[in-house]
Amino acid sequence: NDGKYSHGQNCIDELKKNGVITSHIGIHEGMHTNYHYVLWYDVDRTILVKHEHFPTSFPKDIQTPKMIYLSSLGEGTEDFHEEIMKYVVEHPEVKLVFQPGTFQMKMGIEKLKDIYKNTYAFFCNVEEAQRILNVEDNNIQNLFDKLHALGPKIIFITDGVKGAYASDGTESYFMPIYPHDPYERTGAGDAFASTVSVALLLGKTIKEALTWGPINSMSVVQFVGAQKGLLSMLQLEQHLRDA
């Protein structure tokens, strides 16, 4: 969803420039595009999030996708989550990727139990895992076990500069961060999750996918903002060859 003003049109133009189909994005007269403010100090930041209350609905004429990537949605989207849950249950061949945002964590496990139960790949950081599970334990394996019990088949947990972990319920993996000197960290988690998801969609193993994510995270934190610095597949593959 987008507002029918310059910021919204800029978003649409940027998506089109990068080859993203925008026909399912709703343009709403008289509404503003979501606008978030970032408080930036040293290499870290705090984001002040404000979601507009757009009308939402799952497209009826959509061709069955190979993957759905579900991330941050604002308050007032409970019915939309229900539609997504219903679609995923009715289309088990669709791989659901879930990277919950603030409101989705606030909704709690029970309201989203069918989302968790049918999730193919799940992404969060250590603090988010603790919040979702309502635990103080920061042991990665314990967090994996508790999250797998909710349903996700593959789980990825990031732990800042310590690196990232993955589990399929049988084996666990660890990947250190790609060596870099960060300038501003906004977008690192999104870059990691989306890049790993694409790698899985392309048929890469969990271990292979886990090598892709940190490279795009490394690149995006060299710049201000969440998009500048994102690598094309050719650029990413070159970094892999050079690693």
Write out the residue ranges for each language-model feature.
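Conserved post-catalytic alpha-helical subdomain immediately downstream of the catalytic base
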Residues: 150-152, 176-242
